[in-house]
Structure formats: structure tokens, C-alpha cells
């Protein structure tokens, strides 16, 4: 048993990180302190100076633990790492967890390659970036191949020169085949030097060279080649426009500003490298209600730079940091040289920060508009359905359907929607056990009985163990049951509810002769739905999703049964080999068409078993074709 008063007395007056847990042993908050003794005790003294969010957090603390470190700097680093790993509920959280791509030039190799890299490593290669999108890196790599004919293979050169034939890129004139010795190491190095100049932003030199080549090709009446150079020039110009200069001092800097409303905020970061705007990105932050602007900025900077390997020389911020000196020291240590943190008040730097803030505000507004549209599709649609059925409110809906082929491999599906959105973790599928033949009503009775009786039994078992019933997989009941059908299906569901002494409203989703949603059957009345309403669209989505989930499960069982019925007849081919064959060929048709060599190439197959499979499919012309 955790004795709070005793544990508070044991707290040391040393720097460290404290970790708050709730009664489920979940980490709900992580913080750092110069003195653990003083900081942690503050939470359990007067609550007058605590924000509403922190007061709520304290009320949920069941126990805490702490880790002692040697300095406040170590505490900061550990705090950032723990927040990133555990994403505690009451910490201000950076939603986006992105790592940005780099371009890597393996200058430590005799014939360097130019590659995509997810992170920087200490491997003596030269890195450029980070870039804000994988697409941008792919475009640049493609352009570099066409400009400089650099290799893309993983061959060990010069050791492997001449051992294999040149690859496709040589034949389409995007590689000079150093693997064949067609270009010397010195010449190839010159191309790599030009690549590095290009990646450093020296586009003018490249453009000038391409223009000269285009002119020469045109004068020689080589118009197709001239057109190729023209396209390359346009590609270079397009890239240079994307990375246009935003200042002239050539300093690497990040510009950060944010906009907030309620509990949400959006931070905008401009990435400037070598004085050029490399790109920009926005990040969503939650849990900012009642937080000061300085606190929001501080938490963002800590989480953002804890997860990125590259630290620029300067940060231009819209708000001052609460721990500026400590964070500057931390970032400087990560970078290996001094990092300047500044809130500009005039000039071009202030203009750039204001521009970042305007962009953040725009994204926040767009998000708000999007949320309103989504709510109209989901929560608004659910409210409309509740009003149509005269229900006080609907949060959770469960929809049921049956799928079979003439009673063969009959299955049921349960699809769950909460607040108008699918909750896929709660989907359930049922293989019908008690019904023989195509009887959808009896099958539905079995599915509903199993689903809700299971929930009742599970709730009883959890209650005996003093465990909250919300932890059960079947104990959460819906506010509305949706049946894929009309009066007949609804009556079956109502009978099951009556037998289990449950009072859950049941509604049927009625379709017309063309199998399109027509209305709702509720309380012995069919209620028409406006086909242009969000409620109609939501009902249609639920109906389609329930049908999809049921039919996919039915098809998977039917396919397994078909596979078993054919392959099981082959002597010497057991379950392991049957699975291996289906995994390798994917269908019975493909197995039937396979040669002996193809069959022997399958893992776990030998010459004898391959011969038996081959003979099985080729000795009888009466053998039918079945596919999964």
C-alpha cells in the first residue's frame, strides 16, 4: 500500500524526474525538478496556485516514483525522453511525432553514393537536410541521377568492378556504370563534388552548364537532347524556387510561432538552412488550456528537439521560454556549439516570426472548420438520428449482420460506432454454431444472445474481482442496436433483449428493392430519412461497413474450406505444406499451373511432395478449378 505522507517525507532535495501514476498504474504526468523534495510536495499542499488541469491530475494520483540525477540538465533530458515514450495524459503533448529525411552522400567510399537517410549517423558521410517531406527528397534524388549519373547500387566498389552486368540505370543513361570501370574514380569524384555544390544550393552554376549544353545540342540539330536539357533546367529552377532565400546571412535557424484556442494549439516551424527556406511544417499540440503562452512554447521546444537529431544555430521564437538558459545549454550540448534563442522585436526576423504565427493561425482555423464539418457528419448526424427516434441521446451504436452462402459457413458481424465514428477495436465476428442451413433469423438470434449474455457473464466476473466492468471486452452496452433489416430482424433482437432482461432500443435499417437504404424501422413504424441528410449518410456508412465486415469473414472461412477440401486429398501433403503452398502461390489455380521446379522452390517442399502435387493436378482431366 502506497503511504503518501511517508513517501513525501522520503523525497530527497536533489535534482531528478518525478513520475505520477493513477490507480491503473498508468503514467499520467512526468515532470522535472531541481529539488524533488520541494517540487513534488507542492502538488499536495494548497491547490490555490495550481491550474485546473493540474488540480485534476493531482486528484487522479494513486502513487508516484522518482529518478535522481546529477544535474538539472540531466533531469531535462530524462523528462523529455519519458514524455516522448509514455505520452502522459496531463502533460502538454505534441501530437505529431515526425522524423525528417536527409540526403546522405557517402564521401567515405571510393565511389560515393547519394542516398535517402532517416537520421544522421556518425559514419563519416555528409548529410544534407532535414527536408520536410519524403517526396521532396525523392524528387531531388531523381534530379541528381539525371544530372550527374551517380550510382544507386550497393556494390562494393572498386572490389566488385566487372563482377556483374550493369544495372537498368546504365541502359537508360542515368548512371555511368562505375561498376564496369567505365568511369575513373577521379572523374566520378568530380561528379560527386558537383552534387555537393548542388545540395549546398549552388543552382546557378548547374543552370548555366545546362543552358550551354542545351544551346550546343540545338545548334547540332539534336532537338530531342536539347529538350531533355530544357526539362532539367525547369526542374532545377522549380527546386530553387521552393528553397528561395529568406535571409542573407547563411545561418541555419528554425523560426517557431503558434496559435491556440481552448485546449488545442498549432505550432508552425520554418526551417532555414544556409539562409534558404528549406520548408515549413505545422504541429498539433493538446492539453494547453490554462497554460501560459511561454509554457506552451517551452513544452513544444523541449519535445520537438528531444526527437530531432539536427539542432540549428539559432531559434527565433514568438514567445520567451520559461527555462531559456537551461534549454539553450541543452541544445548547445546536442549541437556541439552555442545555440542562440531569441524573440525578435524588429526587422526581418520579427517579420518572419509574424509570418509563422499567421500560418499557425490559418492552420488552426482550417482545423476548426474541418472539425465542424466532421462533427456535422458524425455527432450532428447521431443527434439527428436520436431526434428521429425520440431518444434522449446516443453515444454508442452496435450494428449486426449475417452472411452465408446457402447456409454454408454462416457468420455474424458486430460493428461499433461511437459518436458517429467507427471503433474498430470493438468490432466482433461470430461463427454460427447452432444453426443448420440458411436461416438468418435463427443465426441473428444466436449472435445477439452470445454477444449480450457474454457481456452479462463478464460483468459478473469482473464485479466479483472488484474490477471496473468498463475493462471488459463485451461489458460496454450500446445506446442503440442497429439491425440490417426491417421488422423481422428487429423483432428477433427485441425478443433477445426481453429474454436477457435488457432494455436497449432496437432499430432496423430498411433497404429498398435496389438494396439502398430507405428508412429506419423503430417502435413498429418505418421512419423515412432525407437522403440528402448527414443522418442518412451515416446510416448508409454503418450499413455498408457491417455488411463488409460480415462478408469478408464469411469469404475467408469459405476460402479456407475450399483450400482444405482440395489439397487435403493429396497424399504426403500435410497442413504445413498446404499452408506453404497457399502462401507461396496464393490460389489453387496458381498451384495447378506450377511446374515441378516451381513447386520444389516452395519452403518445406521436396522433390517427392512436389511430384505428388504435380501428379494430383495433371493426371485427371476431370479435376476442377477452384480459387480462393
Swiss-Prot record:
PROSITE patterns: GIY_YIG (PS50164), UVR (PS50151), UVRC (PS50165). GO terms for biological process: nucleotide-excision repair; SOS response. Gene3D superfamilies: 5' to 3' exonuclease, C-terminal subdomain (1.10.150.20), GIY-YIG endonuclease (3.40.1440.10), UVR domain (4.10.860.10), UvrC, RNAse H endonuclease domain (3.30.420.340). Keywords: Cytoplasm, DNA damage, DNA excision, DNA repair, Excision nuclease, SOS response. One of its GO terms (cellular component) is excinuclease repair complex. It holds the Pfam family GIY-YIG. It is found in: Cytoplasm. SMART domains: GIYc. GO terms for molecular function: DNA binding; excinuclease ABC activity. The keyword Iron-sulfur does not apply. Residues 204-239 form the UVR domain. Residues 13-92 form the GIY-YIG domain. The keyword DNA damage applies. Its main location: cytoplasm. Belongs to the UvrC family. The UvrABC repair system catalyzes the recognition and processing of DNA lesions. UvrC both incises the 5' and 3' sides of the lesion. The N-terminal half is responsible for the 3' incision and the C-terminal half is responsible for the 5' incision. Interacts with UvrB in an incision complex. This is UvrABC system protein C. It comes from Lachnoclostridium phytofermentans (strain ATCC 700394 / DSM 18823 / ISDg).
Amino acid at each position: 500500500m502506497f503511504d503518501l505522507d511517508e513517501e513525501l517525507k522520503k523525497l530527497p532535495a536533489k535534482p531528478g524526474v518525478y513520475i505520477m501514476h493513477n490507480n491503473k498504474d498508468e503514467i499520467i504526468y512526468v515532470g522535472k525538478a531541481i529539488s524533488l523534495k520541494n517540487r513534488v510536495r507542492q502538488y499536495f499542499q494548497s491547490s490555490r496556485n495550481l491550474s485546473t488541469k493540474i488540480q485534476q491530475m493531482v486528484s487522479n494520483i494513486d502513487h508516484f516514483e522518482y529518478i535522481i540525477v546529477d544535474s538539472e540538465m540531466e533531469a531535462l533530458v530524462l523528462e523529455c525522453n519519458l514524455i516522448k515514450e509514455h505520452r502522459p495524459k496531463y502533460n502538454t503533448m505534441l501530437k505529431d511525432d515526425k522524423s525528417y529525411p536527409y540526403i546522405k552522400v557517402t564521401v567515405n567510399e571510393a565511389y560515393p553514393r547519394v542516398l535517402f537517410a532517416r537520421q544522421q549517423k556518425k559514419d563519416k558521410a555528409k548529410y544534407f537536410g532535414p527536408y520536410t517531406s519524403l517526396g521532396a527528397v525523392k524528387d531531388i534524388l531523381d534530379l541528381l541521377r539525371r544530372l550527374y549519373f551517380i550510382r544507386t547500387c550497393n556494390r562494393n566498389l572498386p572490389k566488385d568492378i566487372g563482377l556483374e552486368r550493369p544495372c537498368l540505370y546504365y541502359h537508360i543513361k542515368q548512371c555511368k556504370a562505375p561498376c564496369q570501370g567505365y568511369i575513373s574514380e577521379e572523374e566520378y569524384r568530380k561528379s560527386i563534388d558537383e552534387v555537393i555544390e548542388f545540395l549546398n544550393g549552388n543552382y546557378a552554376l548547374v543552370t548555366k552548364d545546362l543552358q550551354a549544353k542545351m544551346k550546343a545540342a540545338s545548334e547540332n540539330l539534336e532537338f530531342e537532347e536539347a529538350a531533355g536539357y530544357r526539362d532539367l533546367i525547369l526542374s532545377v529552377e522549380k527546386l530553387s524556387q521552393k528553397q528561395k532565400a529568406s535571409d542573407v546571412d547563411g545561418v541555419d535557424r528554425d523560426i517557431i510561432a503558434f496559435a491556440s484556442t481552448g485546449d488545442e494549439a498549432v505550432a508552425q516551424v520554418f526551417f532555414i538552412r544556409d539562409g534558404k527556406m528549406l520548408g515549413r511544417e505545422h504541429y498539433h499540440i493538446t492539453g494547453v488550456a490554462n497554460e501560459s503562452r511561454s509554457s506552451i512554447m517551452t513544452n513544444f521546444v523541449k519535445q520537438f528537439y528531444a526527437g530531432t537529431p539536427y539542432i540549428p544555430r539559432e531559434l527565433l521564437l514568438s514567445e520567451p521560454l520559461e527555462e531559456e538558459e537551461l534549454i539553450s545549454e541543452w541544445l548547445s550540448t546536442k549541437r556541439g556549439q552555442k545555440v542562440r534563442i531569441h524573440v525578435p522585436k524588429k526587422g526581418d526576423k520579427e517579420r518572419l516570426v509574424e509570418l509563422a504565427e499567421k500560418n499557425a493561425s490559418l492552420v488552426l482555423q482550417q482545423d476548426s472548420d474541418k472539425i465542424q464539418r466532421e462533427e456535422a457528419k458524425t455527432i450532428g448526424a447521431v443527434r439527428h438520428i436520436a431526434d428521429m427516434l425520440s431518444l434522449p441521446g446516443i453515444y454508442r451504436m452496435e450494428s449486426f449482420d449475417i452472411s452465408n452462402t446457402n447456409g454454408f459457413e454462416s457468420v455474424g458481424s458486430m460493428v461499433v460506432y461511437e459518436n458517429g465514428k467507427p471503433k474498430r477495436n470493438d468490432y466482433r465476428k461470430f461463427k454460427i454454431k447452432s444453426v443448420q442451413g440458411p436461416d438468418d433469423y435463427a443465426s441473428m438470434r444466436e449472435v445477439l444472445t452470445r454477444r449480450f449474455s457474454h457481456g452479462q457473464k463478464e460483468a459478473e466476473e469482473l464485479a466479483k474481482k472488484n474490477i471496473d466492468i468498463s475493462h471488459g471486452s463485451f461489458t460496454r452496452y450500446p445506446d442503440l442496436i442497429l439491425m440490417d433489416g426491417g421488422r423481422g430482424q428487429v423483432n428477433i433482437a427485441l425478443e433477445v433483449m426481453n429474454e436477457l432482461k435488457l432494455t436497449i432500443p432496437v432499430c432496423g435499417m430498411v433497404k429498398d428493392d435496389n438494396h439502398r437504404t430507405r428508412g429506419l424501422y423503430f417502435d413498429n413504424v418505418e421512419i423515412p430519412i432525407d437522403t440528402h441528410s448527414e443522418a442518412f449518410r451515416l446510416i448508409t456508412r454503418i450499413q455498408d461497413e457491417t455488411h463488409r465486415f460480415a462478408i469478408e469473414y464469411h469469404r475467408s472461412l469459405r476460402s479456407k474450406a475450399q483450400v482444405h477440401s482440395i489439397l487435403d486429398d493429396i497424399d504426403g501433403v500435410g497442413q504445413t505444406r498446404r499452408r506453404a503452398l497457399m502462401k507461396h502461390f496464393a490460389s489453387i489455380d496458381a498451384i495447378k499451373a506450377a511446374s515441378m521446379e516451381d513447386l520444389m522452390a516452395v519452403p518445406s517442399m521436396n522433390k517427392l511432395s512436389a511430384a505428388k502435387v504435380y501428379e494430383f493436378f495433371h493426371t485427371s482431366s476431370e479435376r476442377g478449378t477452384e480459387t480462393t
